[in-house]
UniProtKB/Swiss-Prot annotation:
Entry keywords, A to Z: Amino-acid biosynthesis, Cytoplasm, Histidine biosynthesis, Lyase
EC number: 4.3.2.10
Subcellular location: Cytoplasm
GO MF annotations in UniProt: imidazoleglycerol-phosphate synthase activity; lyase activity
NCBIfam families reported in the protein's UniProt record: hisF (TIGR00735)
GO BP term, example: L-histidine biosynthetic process
Protein name: Imidazole glycerol phosphate synthase subunit HisF
HAMAP family in UniProt: HisF (MF_01013)
Biological pathway: Amino-acid biosynthesis; L-histidine biosynthesis; L-histidine from 5-phospho-alpha-D-ribose 1-diphosphate: step 5/9
The organism of origin for this protein: Dechloromonas aromatica (strain RCB)
Quaternary structure annotation from Swiss-Prot or TrEMBL: Heterodimer of HisH and HisF.
InterPro entries: Aldolase_TIM, His_biosynth, HisF, IGPS_HisA/HisF, RibuloseP-bd_barrel
Active site: D11, D130
Lineage: Bacteria, Pseudomonadati, Pseudomonadota, Betaproteobacteria, Rhodocyclales
Length: 252
């Protein structure tokens, strides 16, 4: 069995790391490079940067942050936000990203997933799904930073992402985002069971038990969290030790 990954997520806007609840009400959490360096030292498996205003405000990609970060942080770096074409993917990879995450543009043009995967390799392509429950056992895909309901079924979209050649799915529950109530385990399990590629669970981590639940009950391959790490409640090392104590294989 592959070791399960713990991935701190940095939501970046205007060059600062922020954290909100249900995609609004943002609170400043610090300098992105400094924070990423701290996670590198704590033993994070990867770090994810999401430029959360890039798609909605048509802002260009945070290349300068990525370049500086890649010089100082030596774990895989995933970057998303404002990715609209294959050229954007290339620019991010050239700046030092290891993987590129796309969301809104992939929904608007699913061929982008296939084109990007074909040109740079599927291992570099992550497709993010922002999902919100609309009925029991049913979730819709939202775009533009969680502002636009596409009406698309999240499970069906996940299957299509898999078929188009993406390397993994970053699955965020908008209902749980920032609430500290734990992952939406039903959503996580439904998507994990529907696809062959790895699924990263995101949205709602409030304690270490939630991280373990994402793997054991949600069947996720990796778990992503922000505020529990940013504001010093837990270190990545503590999270890994807890998961190992629950019998989950992690890289210590």
């Amino acid at each position: 069995m592959l070791a399960k990954r713990i991935i701190p997520c940095l939501d970046v806007t205007a060059g600062r790391v922020v954290k909100g609840t249900n995609f609004v009400g943002l609170r400043d959490a610090g300098d992105p490079i400094e924070i990423a360096r701290r996670y590198n030292e704590q033993g994070a498996d990867e770090v994810t940067f999401l430029d959360i205003t890039a798609s909605s405000d048509q802002r260009d990609i945070i290349l300068h942050i990525i370049e500086a970060c890649a010089e100082q942080v030596f774990i895989p770096l995933t970057v998303g936000g404002g990715v609209r074409k294959v050229e954007d993917v290339r620019r991010l990879l050239n700046a030092g990203a290891d993987k590129v995450s796309m969301n809104t543009a992939a929904v608007q043009n699913p061929d982008l997933i296939f084109d990007a995967s074909s040109k740079v390799g599927s291992q570099c392509i992550v497709v993010a799904i922002d999902a919100k429950q609309v009925a029991p056992g049913q979730w819709h895909v939202f775009t533009h930073g969680g502002r636009n309901d596409t009406g698309m079924d999240a499970i069906e979209w996940a299957k299509k992402i898999d078929a188009l050649g993406a390397g993994e799915i970053l699955l965020t529950s908008m209902d749980r985002d920032g609430t500290k109530n734990g992952f939406d385990l039903a959503l996580t399990r439904a998507v994990s069971d529907a696809v062959k590629i790895p699924v990263i669970a995101s949205g709602g981590v409030g304690n270490l038990q939630h991280l373990a639940d994402g793997v054991t009950e949600g069947r996720a391959d990796a778990v992503l969290a922000a505020s529990i790490f940013h504001f010093g409640e837990y270190t990545v090392r503590q999270a890994k030790e807890y998961m190992a104590s629950r019998g989950i294989e992690v890289r210590l």
